[in-house]
A protein has these predicted regions:
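Conserved anion-binding
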Residues: 1-68, 73-74
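Hydrophobic faces of well-ordered beta-strands that scaffold small-molecule active sites
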Residues: 2-6, 67-69, 97-101, 119-123
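Charged helix-capping and loop-helix junction motifs
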Residues: 49-53, 79-88
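C-terminal helical cap(s) of enzyme catalytic domains, especially alpha/beta-barrels
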Residues: 111-152
């Protein structure tokens, strides 16, 4: 399976510091005046002309099996995922979406799957620093009625 990873950032809206119209170009997934999130590279430092939601759809059309969508606005903040971004991507394509960027507790995982319509969640810091175990996360989600593969024994 090929996973298309997208690093997305919210774009300035009309009247804010930078206009989306400055980045408009001709490609099938390029930014337009209606774009809410752009695709960024180099850890969110370099902008592209791609609209994140359109790019996810185009990637699916080209054969990607899953989309890994990371909000560069919430990544590392541990304040929760960008649920609006997740819903926009998840609701626009038919392949699985993996949420990334923002998990600070187990409720955030649930929110990304439930409110964000994601199919899976990526979490790093909450596991790296021993705040939760993968087993605890799976149990939390299962207790809330989400279909979860049972934990395997070490």
């Amino acid at each position: 399976c090929i996973v298309l990873a997208i690093d997305a950032k919210r774009l300035a809206v009309q009247g804010e510091s930078e206009s989306v119209d400055e980045a408009v170009s001709d490609g099938p997934a390029n930014i337009s005046s209606q774009s809410r999130w752009g695709v960024f590279t180099h850890g969110g430092r370099n902008a592209t002309t791609l609209d994140a939601v359109k790019w996810a759809g185009y990637g699916a059309d080209l054969g990607a099996g899953e989309i890994l969508i990371t909000s560069m606005d919430t990544d590392g903040q541990k304040d929760g995922y960008d649920l609006e971004l997740l819903r926009a991507v998840s609701d626009s394509i038919s392949i699985p979406v993996i949420a990334s960027g923002g998990a600070g507790n187990l409720e955030h995982l649930y929110d990304a799957l439930n409110e964000g319509h994601s199919d899976a969640v990526l979490a790093a810091s909450i596991f790296h620093f021993g705040e939760y175990t993968v087993t605890e996360a799976k149990q939390y989600l299962a207790d809330r009625g989400l279909p979860i593969r049972p934990p395997t024994s070490p």
